[in-house]
């Protein structure tokens, strides 16, 4: 039985402490302080009908703009998103992609989501209870990360916004991450309650920012780019902690992605910047990035 969830992430931050150190302290404090019971997975014999896979989440799973399929549903779900590739990789007997561009945690659990083609029910309501594999990509819209990072954008080539040295920027980032962990934990708990025998995999964020900026695709100084990259590393720390404390699995999609950020050459780029091409979305993984994400997930579930 679910007894209680972590009510907050403790923030420990002194004046010149960087974002990485501050959020690392927050994650460690959360892990040490949280005491709760998470619904354990129900032991079940291997499904005779094969893997029954359900993909949940936001645009990082949906893959808007990757192909024409994404234009035929209000959620922007593409056949080139990592869920389709994972379904093929595991030889899924059934596959249901419920991810929806713009989704926040509440749209997965209990709140209908408006789309360009009407309102869709909460994703969990449409998820079959006999699912044996569930992936989840979530969190980016909860914290509205583009707004947080946009404070680092320079207004001219060669400029430096200096967001890395702005306490207000760090405070906003820390506040956003502080509220994210409990939301993701609750979402994982709701998934477990709906599909008690499922293997649940939480897929991480990041990959867009590397160690440098590139005008105008990522109009950010090299030093601030490192800050932004660190922000996503800390976001992944929060997600990984939610997974670890809920008995689910976490996949870091930035592993193996060095040199494939939005400032990489077009043929090496897996994640788009602000100026994406017609077959990808700004600030999202492109088809190559989705293939990488699928490979990372398959490395865990196969």
What do these predicted ranges mean?
Residues 64-66, 117-176:
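Oxyanion-hole/transition-state-stabilizing segment in secreted/luminal serine hydrolases
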Residues 52-57, 61-63, 94-99, 132-137, ...:
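Structural recognition of the beta-strand scaffold that forms the well-ordered cores
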Residues 206-302:
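Catalytic His-Asp segment of secreted/periplasmic serine-dependent ester chemistry enzymes
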Residues 102-121, 262-277:
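Charged, often glycine-rich, active-site loop that binds/positions anionic groups
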Residues 2-45:
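Secretory targeting and sorting signals
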Residues 45-102, 153-157:
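Serine-esterase "nucleophile elbow" of acetyl-processing enzymes
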Residues 41-52, 85, 116-135, 140, ...:
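Short amphipathic alpha-helices and their capping/turn segments at secondary-structure boundaries
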Residues 133-136, 158-192, 201-242, 246-250:
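Conserved N-terminal glycine/acidic-rich loop preference
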